[in-house]
């Protein structure tokens, strides 16, 4: 039976969302674990997706200048291309810029998760939110972080990003559809395997997440009020939760970019592995229900 979400749940889960959305620890996994551990039931994928809009807004504000430059160059570059089609050949200044190429790289990198997320929506909500899967991925994907840090040469700069990188990191972003993997964990690990500098991979990971998370949150907004979408949250709770996630998420972005400049992503395994093992133990002894 569906229950109404309390304000305590709203605040705590929104804090968790803001803290974990950008860290490679899986925000969806943490929300699934702690909502079940503290209140005995899943808050629901739709509530999670909607409050993600708060953390998404944090990315938009934090990277506003980058986003404006990319969007502006892309629009002007497309206009130059359309002008060429009419036979009025003009300058190609914007189509030769890095920001124009970055616009296409974000679009192309978003396509895999957009297609899989849309086609696999029911599978994700009905089957992949199992706590055994979440706990297992928390542990297993930690070793991917460690391997990526050891194998990656971290020598390529932001200007050296290519369309091939965007495609590979775009498919890696699809792994975030599985709770316990982490969106940033999947894309940054792929970037490290591609020998990108850690900070470069992290910044591109943020830019790549913008279309996917924004679309996911908006697409799930009507479902958040459905009795079949997990706990029922009111409009006021969704608004407050989104605001909390925004404030905490903004601080998390600033902290993470400073952290990755001098620290390995493998450090996050020290939290992921014990948490995953602890959840497995609680499941095995019947304290938690999958």
Swiss-Prot record:
Compartments, record wording: Cell membrane
One cellular component term from this protein's GO annotations in UniProt: plasma membrane
Disulfide-bond pairs as recorded: none
InterPro entries from the UniProt entry: UppP
Group of enzyme by EC: hydrolase
A GO term for molecular function: undecaprenyl-diphosphatase activity
Keyword DNA-binding in annotation: no
EC number assigned by the record: 3.6.1.27
Gene Ontology annotations of biological process type: cell wall organization; peptidoglycan biosynthetic process; regulation of cell shape; response to antibiotic
Catalytic activity: di-trans,octa-cis-undecaprenyl diphosphate + H2O = di-trans,octa-cis-undecaprenyl phosphate + phosphate + H(+)
Domain of life: Bacteria
Protein family per UniProt: Belongs to the UppP family.
Entry protein name: Undecaprenyl-diphosphatase 2
Species annotation: Corynebacterium jeikeium (strain K411)
Lineage, top ranks: Bacteria, Bacillati, Actinomycetota, Actinomycetes, Mycobacteriales
Annotated gene: uppP2
């Amino acid at each position: 039976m569906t229950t109404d979400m309390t304000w305590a749940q709203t605040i705590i889960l929104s804090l968790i969302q803001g803290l974990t959305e950008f860290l490679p620890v899986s925000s969806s996994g943490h929300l699934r674990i702690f909502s079940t551990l503290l209140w005995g039931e899943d808050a629901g994928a739709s509530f999670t997706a909607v409050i993600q809009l708060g953390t998404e807004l944090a990315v938009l504000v934090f990277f506003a200048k980058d986003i404006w430059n990319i969007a502006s160059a892309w629009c002007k570059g497309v206009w130059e291309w359309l002008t060429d089609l009419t036979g009025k050949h003009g300058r190609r200044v914007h189509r030769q810029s890095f920001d124009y190429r970055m616009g296409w790289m974000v679009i192309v990198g978003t396509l895999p998760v957009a297609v899989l997320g849309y086609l696999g929506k029911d599978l994700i909500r009905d089957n992949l939110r199992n706590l055994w899967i979440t706990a297992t991925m928390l542990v297993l994907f930690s070793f991917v972080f460690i391997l990526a840090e050891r194998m990656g040469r971290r020598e390529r700069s932001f200007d050296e990003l290519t369309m091939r990188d965007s495609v590979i990191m775009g498919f890696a972003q699809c792994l975030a559809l599985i709770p316990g993997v982490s969106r940033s964990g999947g894309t940054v690990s792929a970037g490290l395997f591609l020998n990108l500098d850690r900070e470069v991979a992290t910044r591109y990971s943020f830019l790549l997440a913008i279309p996917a998370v924004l679309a996911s949150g908006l697409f799930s907004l009507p479902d958040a009020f459905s009795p079949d979408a997990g706990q029922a949250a009111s409009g006021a709770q969704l608004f407050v939760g989104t605001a909390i996630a925004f404030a905490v998420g903004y601080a998390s972005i600033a902290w993470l970019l400073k952290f990755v400049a001098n620290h390995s992503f493998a450090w996050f395994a020290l939290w992921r592995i014990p948490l995953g093992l602890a959840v497995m133990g609680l499941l095995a002894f019947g304290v938690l229900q999958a």
